[in-house]
Amino acid sequence: RLMAFSTLLCIAYLVANTLLMGFSLSTILVTTFVWCAFNVSVSIQKLVVAFLPIILFVLIYDFMRVYPNYMVNPIDTKGLYDLEMQLFGFNSTNGTLIPSEYFNNNHWLITDILSGIFYLCWVPLPIVYGLYLYFTKQKRICIRFTSAFLLVNLIGFAGYYIHPAAPPWYVMQYGFVPDFSIGGHV
């Protein structure tokens, strides 16, 4: 029964994903992996259930492409920039700068490396910590931790839609007018 339910769920996800976002081999591979992991053995099934909140996070994040935040509310390019300038702006030889403008002009290798590491760890580190909790027999804490991870990210997603904002690099490079022809930037 559980296998039939998980199979139906995976097929429904693949159909919805394909209809809304187009065919993707990576989606099929990930869905197949989750289905196999869920149906291989009871012990692995328990691991998948413990990490269901993180799987939900990934699915929700993926489906956010279907209805972009700028279709819900207008993108704020100036308001948050001005607020950051008031709260964190500081004087330099180039005038008053927000921190990202300052660090854009003053690269320090160690801060660039540390920033990159912290940025890259915001998803993998909680997953590793969740696995640590799970495999050290702290399954209840693992489930609470992964659920908290999902909740915090859902709050972030809500903020992303309630008040869409341009990142500091966008304002530095393109100004305050939204231009949807510009691609992503890392």
Language-model segments: residues:
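Membrane-interface elements of multi-pass transporters and channels
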Residues: 67-75, 137-138, 165-170
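Hydrophobic, aromatic-rich transmembrane alpha-helices
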Residues: 126-133
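Membrane-interfacial catalytic/cofactor-binding modules of polytopic membrane enzymes
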Residues: 158-186
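N-terminal transmembrane-helix/juxtamembrane module of multi-pass inner/ER membrane proteins
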Residues: 1-27, 42-126
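Membrane-interface helix-boundary motifs at transmembrane edges
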Residues: 38-49, 134-144
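Central hydrophobic cores of alpha-helical transmembrane segments in multi-pass inner-membrane proteins
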Residues: 28-40
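Structural signal for membrane-spanning alpha-helices in multi-pass inner-membrane proteins
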Residues: 36-39, 130, 160, 164
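Small-polar-interrupted transmembrane alpha-helices in polytopic inner-membrane proteins
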Residues: 147-160
